[in-house]
């Protein structure tokens, strides 16, 4: 099972060193773990986890103030990238067109893409979730060999309110009919619900936010998944 930690706008360079040290001392070679750290915390060490980027601009380098280009990621041998997270869609107004340009750039470079999709509460309550997710997936090449899709219902992100096991299973099973790629669930994943989520046949892993920010808490979640 895949365990992806999205640290978002958390951890300094110093605190991430401690975070990484705890993971390195406790993870095994059999653990499939990626950590999407803030760019200021990137390092060149070899870890027991894959280091990923929360964001990038689709360029080698250039006049793009505040952005992160391929040359910068290459320095740290980063090949895993998040695209389409709802916080970037909503807060930073990343459009479907721009997300497509990011996806195409990542695919051209052979990166591992974790493409995030998810509906808001009104869409969910109106029963239009599957149609909405289908439209989001029309934006990318579902045949790309290094694609992972992360389903994160917006109404469950950082709210403490996770989708029910039945809801997650229904949506991920539907997505399996759309794309033969690994599927992740994200949205208030924690140590209390991870075992049930891990038991969903169509679920290949989790994208964890708040519960991953503390290294020991994240390790506890990983351990709880196999109990």
UniProtKB/Swiss-Prot annotation:
Catalyzed reactions per annotation: D-glyceraldehyde 3-phosphate = dihydroxyacetone phosphate
Primary site of residence: cytoplasm
Gene Ontology biological process terms from the UniProt entry: gluconeogenesis; glyceraldehyde-3-phosphate biosynthetic process; glycerol catabolic process; glycolytic process
Keyword vocabulary terms for this entry: Cytoplasm, Gluconeogenesis, Glycolysis, Isomerase
EC number in record: 5.3.1.1
Family assignment from sequence similarity: Belongs to the triosephosphate isomerase family.
PANTHER family according to UniProt: TRIOSEPHOSPHATE ISOMERASE (PTHR21139:SF42)
Protein's name in the database: Triosephosphate isomerase
Species: Campylobacter concisus (strain 13826)
Gene: tpiA
């Amino acid at each position: 099972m895949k365990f992806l930690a999205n640290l978002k706008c958390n951890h300094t360079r110093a605190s991430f060193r401690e975070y990484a040290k705890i993971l390195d001392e406790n993870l095994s070679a059999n653990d499939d773990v990626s950590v999407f750290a803030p760019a200021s915390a990137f390092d060149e060490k070899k870890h027991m986890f894959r280091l990923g980027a929360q964001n990038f601009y689709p360029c080698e380098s250039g006049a793009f103030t505040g952005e992160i280009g391929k040359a910068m990621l290459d320095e740290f041998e980063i090949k895993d990238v998040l695209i389409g997270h709802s916080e970037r869609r909503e807060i930073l107004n990343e459009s479907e067109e721009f997300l497509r340009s990011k996806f195409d750039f990542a695919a051209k470079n052979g990166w591992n893409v974790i493409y995030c999709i998810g509906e808001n509460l009104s869409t969910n309550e109106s029963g239009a979730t599957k149609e909405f997710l289908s439209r989001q997936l029309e934006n990318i090449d579902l045949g790309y060999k290094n694609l992972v899709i992360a389903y994160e219902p917006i109404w469950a992100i950082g709210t403490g309110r996770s989708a029910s096991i039945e809801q997650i299973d229904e949506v991920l099973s539907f997505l399996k009919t759309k794309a033969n790629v690994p599927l992740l669930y994200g949205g208030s994943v924690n140590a209390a619900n991870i075992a049930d989520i891990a038991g969903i046949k169509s679920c290949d892993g989790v994208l964890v936010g708040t519960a991953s920010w503390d290294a020991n808490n994240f390790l506890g979640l990983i351990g709880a998944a196999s109990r």
